[in-house]
Amino acid sequence: MRLTAKQVTWLKVSLHLAGLLPFLWLVWAINHGGLGADPVKDIQHFTGRTALKFLLATLLITPLARYAKQPLLIRTRRLLGLWCFAWATLHLTSYALLELGVNNLALLGKELITRPYLTLGIISWVILLALAFTSTQAMQRKLGKHWQQLHNFVYLVAILAPIHYLWSVKIISPQPLIYAGLAVLLLALRYKKLRSLFKRLRKQVHNKLSV
C-alpha cells in the first residue's frame, strides 16, 4: 500500500517534531542540570550528533523510497536536509560562542584552519549551507542541470562529517564508529552512482589538465 499525499503531510509534521523535540530537551537539560561534567562539550556533541542523524535520515530516504516503492516519500527529503543544516548551524554556533566565547570570535578563522577536524567540519557546513539555500523549487529551476551537480556534494558531507566526529573525540567509542558505519552503508547503496560521478569528475579534471 502506497503512502497518500495526506499521509506524507502528517509524516512531515512528525519529522518537524523530531527536529524540534531534541532542541526542547537540550534547553530543559541546560536549565535543569541534565548535562554532564563538561556541559559545553555535551552541547557540542549533542548538536553534532543530531545533525548527523538528520544527515543519515536524509540519505536513507531515496533508497527507502525505491525499495519500498513509496515515491511520495521523496517529498520528506528536503525537510530532513533542512533540519540537518539547522542542527549543524547550532553545532557550529555552540563551538563559536561556548568554546571560544564572544570575546574570542576573532580566533574562529584561525581555529578552523589550524585544526584539521574543524576544517572538515566547516567544509561540511558550507556545503550544507549551499544545499539549504538552493533547496527550493525556484532555485532548482534556476540552476537547471547544475542543481543536481551541486546537490551531489551531500555525499562528500556524508564522508567528511563522520570523520570530523571521529577525529573530534579524544577516546574512540562505539558511537562515532556506528555513525561512520551507517554513512558507509548508505553510500554503498549508491555505489554505481558514486562510481559514475567519480569517473565523470576524473574525466573533467583530465580534460582541464590537458588544455
From Swiss-Prot:
It is a multi-pass membrane protein. GO terms for cellular component: plasma membrane. It is found in: Cell inner membrane. GO terms for biological process: protein repair. InterPro entries: Fe3_Rdtase_TM_dom (IPR013130), MsrQ-like (IPR022837). Keywords: Cell inner membrane, Cell membrane, Electron transport, Flavoprotein, FMN, Heme, Iron, Membrane, Metal-binding, Transmembrane, Transmembrane helix, Transport. It comes from the Bacteria. GO terms for molecular function: electron transfer activity; FMN binding; heme binding; metal ion binding; oxidoreductase activity, acting on diphenols and related substances as donors. Its cofactor is FMN; heme b. The chain crosses the membrane at residues 17-37, 82-102, 116-136, 153-173. Binds 1 FMN per subunit. Belongs to the MsrQ family. Part of the MsrPQ system that repairs oxidized periplasmic proteins containing methionine sulfoxide residues (Met-O), using respiratory chain electrons. Thus protects these proteins from oxidative-stress damage caused by reactive species of oxygen and chlorine generated by the host defense mechanisms. MsrPQ is essential for the maintenance of envelope integrity under bleach stress, rescuing a wide series of structurally unrelated periplasmic proteins from methionine oxidation, including the primary periplasmic chaperone SurA and the lipoprotein Pal. Heterodimer of a catalytic subunit (MsrP) and a heme-binding subunit (MsrQ). This is Protein-methionine-sulfoxide reductase heme-binding subunit MsrQ.
